[in-house]
Amino acid sequence: TVDYAFKRVFGKNGNESILKDLLESILNIEIKSITIQNPEIPKNMKDGKIGILDVRAELNGDEITEVEMQVQDQHNIDKRSPTYLTKIYSDQLKEGEQYIEVKKVVVINILNFDYYKRNSYHSVARMMFEKSKENEKVDLGYIVEDKYATKDLEMHFIELPKFRKKDPDMSNKLEQWLCLICDEEETTMSYTEEVY
């Protein structure tokens, strides 16, 4: 299946350069170091559920990135993704540790279905402040206000059916990768392994 092939190629130790290239194209950052980690999210004590994502990596020593390939729409990605995000974030802090030690967490959802009513195939969600109500404003002299409550939590949603509807820009690294991912034949994954 596509998600199995995805995990086999991008989540395999020794394939860090392939994963690095994909993540740089999605996150638009330079990755200096990457470590592929165990993608299992520890069991929740209440419901006993274990979450297993396709790929987990630590980037540049200060960011945890999870990638999940969803082939079928289970009508819950708007609940599932934030649950994984906050669980990974909170599980970092052990008793007695300082909050300053908590790393940024990014969850990337590559969806083989349309989910959100948005006109972009790649949507990024962060915790942003809403616009202040006029009667709640206090003149404190801030010319530019903070936009984010925190930059530590981030979700990406890449909806492949939307991407398939556009002419890909083959000079764009992300669109090159999405063309490969959209081609569900095993030969594509084999080719990717050979190239790298």
What are these regions (language model features)?
Residues 1-196:
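Elongated, amphipathic alpha-helical interaction scaffolds
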